[in-house]
């Protein structure tokens, strides 16, 4: 847990104005579909901040921020990978490539995207739906 949650000015200074807009749009899209707990944390070695969407002790996804970069991570477990693989041709090339290049660990595939625009957002929502049905109408 962070002592102080970064404000708009701090986030804009960190990732830049255009990526901060992507961050805001991605958060809005997730919030539109899911009622989740949202937790700010330190981003570990590679990132400055982590912003995690969780409910009932399970993580849906996490957003990450560092200098001039925004990350979106989703972890697909075994059953979720099977669902993705059955439907993979309906995902864009970049999502398929990242899926294929991501190492599989004992607890799943930790897929990290670094969006610079909104072009992958439909695929992100489709991936999130594999993990959990939207709970907002």
Segments (PLM) and residue ranges:
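Charge-dense, helix-prone N-terminal extensions
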Residues: 1-137
């Amino acid at each position: 847990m962070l002592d102080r949650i970064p404000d708009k000015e701090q986030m804009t200074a960190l990732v830049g104005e255009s990526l901060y807009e992507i961050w805001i749009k991605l958060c809005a899209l997730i919030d539109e579909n899911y009622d989740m707990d949202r937790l700010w944390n330190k981003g570990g070695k590679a990132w400055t901040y982590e912003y995690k969407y969780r409910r009932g002790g399970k993580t849906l996804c996490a957003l990450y921020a560092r200098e001039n970069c925004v990350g979106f991570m989703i972890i697909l477990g075994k059953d979720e990978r099977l669902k993705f693989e059955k439907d993979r041709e309906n995902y864009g090339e970049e999502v398929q490539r990242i899926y294929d290049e991501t190492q599989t660990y004992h607890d799943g595939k930790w897929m990290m995207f670094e969006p610079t625009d909104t072009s992958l957002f439909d695929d992100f929502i489709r991936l999130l739906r594999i993990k959990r049905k939207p709970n907002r109408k």
